[in-house]
């Protein structure tokens, strides 16, 4: 069976990744 707790965490990781990219883009 798939691990739904991991699937639920994926959107948060994507949001964190997007925020990090935005911050780096602003600093550049």
Swiss-Prot record:
Keywords: Lipid transport, Secreted, Transport, VLDL
A cellular component term, taken from the record's GO annotations: very-low-density lipoprotein particle
Single biological process term from Gene Ontology: lipoprotein metabolic process
Compartments (UniProt record): Secreted
UniProt keyword Transport present: yes
Pfam families documented for this protein: ApoC-I (PF04691)
Function statement: Inhibitor of lipoprotein binding to the low density lipoprotein (LDL) receptor, LDL receptor-related protein, and very low density lipoprotein (VLDL) receptor. Associates with high density lipoproteins (HDL) and the triacylglycerol-rich lipoproteins in the plasma and makes up about 10% of the protein of the VLDL and 2% of that of HDL. Appears to interfere directly with fatty acid uptake and is also the major plasma inhibitor of cholesteryl ester transfer protein (CETP). Binds free fatty acids and reduces their intracellular esterification.
This protein's name: Apolipoprotein C-I
Organism: Oryctolagus cuniculus
């Amino acid at each position: 069976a798939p691990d739904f707790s991991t699937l639920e965490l994926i959107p948060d990781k994507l949001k964190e990744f997007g925020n990090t990219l935005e911050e780096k883009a602003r600093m550049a």
